[in-house]
Structure formats: structure tokens, C-alpha cells
């Protein structure tokens, strides 16, 4: 669903945030503008989404619609190899934390030598669990919204 349609359907009822057991759903403030005020969003570094889909079950207007977890598309992970410990030169260190956090390992992300992660953009749902788990600061992997 396009953002414009989502914004027209969302009635700012906060039910999605109340039902979210992971606590990943936050709400925009007025400072973001009246058109998006009080609408839900996810800040992956703070708390990634487990794609439980409970938010879609309680949405009274269909602004959030149920889809299979692997079909969710909130964004895509982008890896900065220059910052990733597994790619560090001259001596890479085994890390793989992002891979182990991924809910779709082997599909959305694979790993190679030294646990070097490889993101598969077509399969990445943008849940942010990899970004949340990244031990490098600033994080070597980030979610880019779509």
C-alpha cells in the first residue's frame, strides 16, 4: 500500500501499538507534520519488528493489512562492509550477529567466510532485527525504508 493511501486509512487509534508484544511500534508526533501525526512507525535500531502481524489483526480500517511474514516489505537492509567487523582489514573477526538475528536466515541473508553477511534485497522484509542486533556503533547494517 502506498503511503498516501495508508495515511488516508489510518484513524490514529493506536491499537497497533497496544497489541505489539515486541513494542516496536512507535507513533509520530506533531513535530513530523499534521499529515503523519500519531501514525505508527518502526525505528529498527530501537526495536525491530518480529513480523507477528498482530497489528494487522486489530487495525479497524485496513491501513495495516495481513500478509505472509516473508511478503512484508517495510524496507531493505543495507550493509556497509567498511564498518562490518566480519569484513575488517587486515584481520576480519567472526561476528555474524546480524545473520543470527534475521528471522529468515538463508533466505533474506546468508553468510560466508568469517560470518560475512550477504543481504538478499528481494527477500529482505526490512524488519530491522539485524540493525538492532549489530554490535558496531554506528551500526554497519541499516534498514532503508521503501
Located regions from the model:
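Intrinsically disordered, low-complexity Ser/Thr- and acidic-rich flexible linkers and loops
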Residues: 89-93
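Gly/Gly-Pro-rich "capping" loops immediately C-terminal to redox-active cysteine motifs
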Residues: 31-45, 75-77
